[in-house]
Swiss-Prot record:
Residues 41-52 have a biased composition (Polar residues). InterPro entries: Ribosomal_uL4 (IPR002136), Ribosomal_uL4-like (IPR013005), Ribosomal_uL4_dom_sf (IPR023574). Belongs to the universal ribosomal protein uL4 family. GO terms for molecular function: rRNA binding; structural constituent of ribosome. The gene is rplD. GO terms for biological process: translation. Part of the 50S ribosomal subunit. Residues 60-71 have a biased composition (Basic residues). Keywords: Ribonucleoprotein, Ribosomal protein, RNA-binding, rRNA-binding. This is Large ribosomal subunit protein uL4. One of its GO terms (cellular component) is ribonucleoprotein complex.
Length: 211
C-alpha cells in the first residue's frame, strides 16, 4: 500500500490517498513489463508495407534482345531486380504483427509499471470545475503549481475527459491525457511525471484490481 499526498488546484496539500496494487515479483517484473511494452508497440504497426517482385511488376514478358551475338550482357526481362523499374528482391509484404498476451498478464504488467513510477506520481483534486472554459494557460499554470517543470513529459489521468479539459490540454505537446480505465504501459513508462486526480486513482484501483 502506498500513501500519496493530494494537492488542490492551488498546489496546497489537502489530504492523502492510498493506492494498493498487486504487482509482479521483483525477479519477474522487468520481464513482464518488457513483454507488455513490446506487445503494445508491435501491435501499433500497420504492417501494410508492400513491394512488387519481378513477377508482379507490369511488363517484362519479352526478352529484350537475343541471347548471343549482340555483345551485351544476357538479359531475359526488363523487370529483373538488377534493372531500374524492375522488381524488388526480398522486399516487405503485408504482414500481421499482432502479438498476444493474456489479459491477467497485461493487467499485471500495467500495475507493475504504475507501481514503478510511484515516486513520480502526483495526486490532485478533481479540477473539472476549475476549468469552466478551455484555458490552456490555466492548466499549464496548475501543472507548475503542482511541481512540474515545463520541459517534462506529463501523463494526466482523469476519471472522465470533459471537453474543457481536452481542449485545454490538446495544444500542449508534453501533456498526454488519459482516462483512468484506458492506461497503457508505454505512456506510464515514458512520462517524466504522472498526474492523477483522486477520483481517477480510485478508478484505477477498481478497474485494474487483481480480481
Amino acid at each position: 500500500m502506498v500513501n500519496c499526498i493530494i494537492k488542490n488546484w492551488q498546489g496546497e496539500e489537502v489530504g492523502q490517498a492510498t493506492l494498493e496494487l498487486k504487482v509482479a515479483k521483483e525477479e519477474n517484473a522487468a520481464h513482464i513489463v518488457h513483454r507488455a511494452l513490446v506487445r503494445q508497440q508491435t501491435n501499433a504497426r500497420q504492417g501494410t508495407a508492400s513491394t512488387k517482385t519481378r513477377a508482379e511488376v507490369r511488363g517484362g514478358g519479352r526478352k529484350p534482345w537475343r541471347q548471343k551475338g549482340t555483345g551485351r550482357a544476357r538479359a531475359g526481362s526488363i523487370r529483373s531486380p538488377l534493372w531500374r523499374g524492375g522488381g524488388v528482391t526480398f522486399g516487405p509484404k503485408p504482414k500481421d504483427f499482432n502479438v498476444k498476451m493474456n489479459r491477467k498478464e497485461r493487467r499485471l504488467a500495467l500495475r507493475t509499471a504504475l507501481d514503478s513510477r510511484i515516486e513520480d506520481l502526483i495526486v490532485v483534486e478533481n479540477f473539472a470545475e476549475q476549468l469552466t472554459q478551455p484555458k490552456t494557460k490555466e492548466l499549464v499554470s496548475a501543472l507548475t503549481r503542482w511541481g512540474i517543470d515545463g520541459n517534462q513529459k506529463v501523463v494526466l489521468i482523469v476519471s472522465e475527459i470533459t471537453d474543457n479539459i481536452q481542449l485545454s490540454a490538446r495544444n500542449v505537446p508534453y501533456i498526454k491525457l488519459l482516462k483512468a480505465d484506458g492506461l497503457n504501459v508505454y505512456d506510464l513508462l515514458v512520462a517524466d511525471k504522472i498526474v492523477a486526480t483522486a477520483e481517477a486513482l480510485s478508478k484505477v484501483q477498481e478497474v485494474y484490481s487483481d480480481s
